[in-house]
Amino acid sequence: MDQIDEFLDKVNCTEKYMMEGNHDNWLNYAVEKYPYIPQYKFKTAVKLKERGYKYYPAGKYLKSLGKLSFYHGHLYGGQYHAANHLRKKGCSIMYGHWHDLQQHSITHDSGVKSAWSIGCLKDMSPKANGWLNYRDVNWSHAFAIVDFFKGGLFTVHIIQIIKGKTSLWGELITG
């Protein structure tokens, strides 16, 4: 969290949101099982209130900015999870739980709605994911840039990172 806050401070971010995910929620399960360790409840352990974050617990909670909603993304899965999210949520939505890249759109009378699975930024090597029995995963390194416009409209740009390299606004970025 310190690294995230440091970056957000550098870009003068004034609104910070934390949507709890399934891994974060493991701390809450431990506190339920062992109530004498309440300081390990997720939002307490990472000091979200002190850091100035608006907190959304794990589950069905959505945060909407304009006409785009965000949440962790673990409620609907399968091979076509972006289509499942769009069909079941019924709104434009972005999530990260599945760590891969998918996008699905549908046009209604009210306009186009889309769902995006935006990948991840973690080490995807089998060695770093021993908890998955060292199997290969269908994950992708990526992040999203979202531009918001008047009337709640927005555009989404998914920036995929291949072997530590990407191109953003005409500039090669390596890491």
Predicted segments — roles?
Residues 1-51:
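Core catalytic region of metal-dependent phosphoesterases/phosphodiesterases
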Residues 4-5, 56-60, 78-83:
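A generic local structural motif
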Residues 15-22, 56-60, 157-161:
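Acidic carboxylate-rich catalytic motifs and surrounding loops in phosphoryl-/glycosyl-chemistry enzymes
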Residues 49-65:
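Short acidic low-complexity segments
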Residues 65-159:
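Conserved beta-sheet core of the metallophosphoesterase superfamily
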Residues 70, 173-175:
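Basic, amphipathic N-terminal segments that precede the first structured/catalytic domain
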Residues 157-173:
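Polar, enzyme-active/binding microenvironments
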